[in-house]
Amino acid sequence: MEYKNTLLMPKTEFPMRGNLPKREPAMQEKWAEMNIYETVQEHTKGRPLFVLHDGPPYANGDIHMGHALNKVLKDFIVRYKSMTGFCAPYVPGWDTHGLPIEQALTNKGVKRKEMTVAEFRKLCAEYAYEQVERQREQFKRLGVRADWDNPYITLEPAYEAQQIKVFGDMAKKGYIYKGQKPVYWSPTSESALAEAEIEYQDKKSASIYVAFSVKDGKNVLEGDEKYIIWTTTPWTLPANLGISVHPELEYAIVKVNDEKYIIASELFETVAKTLEWENAEVVKTVKGSELEYTVAKHPFYDRDSLVMLGDHVTTDAGTGCVHTAPGHGEDDFIVGKKYGLEVLCPVDDKGVLTEEAPGFEGLFYDKANKPITEKLEEVGALLKLTFITHSYPHDWRTKKPIIFRATAQWFASIEAFRKELLEAVAETKWVPAWGETRLHNMVRDRGDWCISRQRAWGVPIPVFYAENGDPIITDETINHVADLFREHGSNVWFEREAKDLLPEGFTHPGSPNGEFRKETDIMDVWFDSGSSHQAVLEERDDLQRPADLYLEGSDQYRGWFNSSLSTAVAVTGKAPYKGVLSHGFVLDGEGRKMSKSIGNIVVPKKIMDQLGGDILRLWVSSVDYQSDVRISDDILKQVAEVYRKIRNTFRFLLGNLDDFKPSENTVAVAELREVDRYMLVKLNDLITKVKEAYETYDFAAVYHAIHNFCTIDLSSFYLDFAKDILYIEGANHEDRRAIQTVLYDVLVALTKLVTPILPHTADEVWPYIPGVTEESVQLTDMPEAVQLDDAEALKTKWDAFMTLRDDVLKALEVARNEKVIGKSLNASITLYPTAEMKAMLESINEDLKQLFIVSEYKLGGMMEEAPADAPKYEHTAVVVAQATGETCERCWVVSETIGKDAEHETLCERCATVVKENYVK
């Protein structure tokens, strides 16, 4: 007889190799056929809502690792929530207006100047939709479950109409105004920028010290002194109209040879060293407040420079006398306004100096630095020129430096509701907790929000102007424009004359002739996405405002988290979110930012094509995403290894449940052996731990808990010794069915627990599980931890056994290395444990040689009675010897009972019995 045919070896069709790049698209087709998103929504209908609101990625180009990290994290949460008693809709969105799309078309050769604005905008819309389609397919490939057929897209008419309503609401409350103010201006984009659109990079700049001669000392100064200012922007000097000093600072009049200079007293030593003064002496000191209204002369123009008081003056750098150009700085503007100075801004949209800067007109601002410095030298006003490298604001899109420039812009003032904004921040749950401080400080310190842009591709600012120049924003005009946009899209603004955009028969006292103009500026894209709480959460029946969670990269504190909060509090008085979670950026394996120049860009598509979406998702779960995270081939290799371990565990469990029918073969918990119940306790601990980790968005804890359970609790212990029972005993042996009962519970629970992270794999495993009826594991709930009555006692006893077992394994390893035995089944072990461990071993009813995977087990005396040469460990001394007897052909145990049964000469007594009872007719 072929004894190998009497072994119940694992049997399953579930493939060993994942082959995810091929298998996942097939699984996604199956999901599409069963309308998985709608099916899950239907299945969870009537449950409490959990709304994670998608911050819209910008529709331009392929998705990058930051997108993948973001969307996968969101998917973990939404999938988990739908398996724990919630209805968790997920509506993806796209941000589709703005400069990058205009630039992309220009780069493709679109001749913008040869077409109308409306025609150009149509091309922008087409391009944006193409990008949405491209990204949608890539997000789907990641396995993200979403309402892909009904996303929100910021260029869609219904969305734009709601955005107009938000603007109108804010205007009605007095939060929207037009004013001339210095704003961040990008000469390369030819548009104003919001704070969220700037990034800081190092830039080399001229650092100059300039003397301004006193013209009128107002009886405080004698008139022969000179104020010294310091600046790193010489190009702004043609716009200088004043000098600011701090009212509380003490200023020194310093005599250097025949000159007298005015600087802040506490900066005397620093300035003296920088300007290489020798024999400098302070001849007089005055308080800053006394210098108010003294007048200096502009160094190269025939005009005055008024000395004013400003709290913005510091002694961190410079001289304590600050060059003030109201057209080129926020503080300068505020101080200048207070003193009635004009707002002079001799720089045009392209960053070129105008005729208001005589002698330098036609020069690009950065190119004007040199001739202006030369002019200062020529008139004897330049005291020092050096070059410094400092952090300077740049346009986040063009990566070129920006300037402060006063222009007429539309602003949203947050002053009137700053207190409510700060209260809303305090009421929100922030993860990580430092997010609260970060946004609080931003809101506390931020100025008015410049919401206008001088571009073509965006939502128009819905303002009309009367003949006398009065801006017109009324409920009537706002509602009418919103209706027009809802019906025709915002392009109608560029296709029709102002009068055709106004309500029928509209009149205004400022337009006696019935003539009107329309605003040509568009809204900042942050106003677009920042209106999504109104356009999406409030408008869609399947969602609600406030959302439970906003989850984006940490750059969104100044972006979407901020703009959404501002518009929501302005319109509703409340935050649009209950909770905010932020993640870091994706770096390469060495912790460097990814860039084309370094050539270290990792692309999601490549990972999915080579390894699969579930490997990328498993990587996301493995990292501490709240900080910056790393990815590389080596890191992915480690993750793929963990995936292999998890997959092999599933395969082993399925293979050993091939003949198990849950309805017939399940053993009641009370009838299970202790070691089996101990495994259930470990499983329940895992369920509790994993669910708690999901609840707190700690996905790395989920990853480690599942990996450890598969490798330590299952592979290294339970599954290892169980093979001797599963393969060797008869199919219906009580111990075998007991183990299968445990394996079944483990398999079902484990499949559900990994579903949010590995949905493709979980749904691949699911139909192989005996007795399941649901079409997809996604239509089930997370497993519940079942508390066994004797759980604590089991844990205490069997945890102790596991520590003792570790000692035994060490001893077997030593014996193997010393060639005492070949494999552990060749061994006979005698233990000399501590008193505590001896009592524990004596209380175990299970076959201990099976648990230790040896052929013979003996309990000697106490530890102190062990032979002198016996290796001693923490809990026991262990004597390892070669087991006596022969090796059974069927179970490989070394036994002295081989051949006792004459019919089965090569089998041990146990195997002979099993064969006779189950296989001999």
Curated annotation (Swiss-Prot):
Gene Ontology CC annotations of this record: cytosol
Major localization class: cytoplasm
List of residues binding ATP: K596
Positions contributing to L-isoleucyl-5'-AMP binding: E552
Subcellular location: Cytoplasm
Pfam families: Anticodon_1, tRNA-synt_1, zf-FPG_IleRS
Coiled coil: none
Chain ranges for the short sequence motif 'HIGH' region as given in the UniProt record: 57-67
Residue pairs linked by disulfide bridges in the UniProt entry: none
InterPro entries: aa-tRNA-synth_I_CS, aa-tRNA-synth_Ia, Anticodon_Ile_BEm, Ile-tRNA-ligase, Ile-tRNA-ligase_type1, Ile-tRNA_ligase, M/V/L/I-tRNA-synth_anticd-bd, Rossmann-like_a/b/a_fold
Binding of Zn(2+), residues: C888, C891, C908, C911
Record text about domains: IleRS has two distinct active sites: one for aminoacylation and one for editing. The misactivated valine is translocated from the active site to the editing site, which sterically excludes the correctly activated isoleucine. The single editing site contains two valyl binding pockets, one specific for each substrate (Val-AMP or Val-tRNA(Ile)).
Record family assignment: Belongs to the class-I aminoacyl-tRNA synthetase family. IleS type 1 subfamily.
Protein name in UniProt: Isoleucine--tRNA ligase 1
Source organism of the structure: Bacillus anthracis
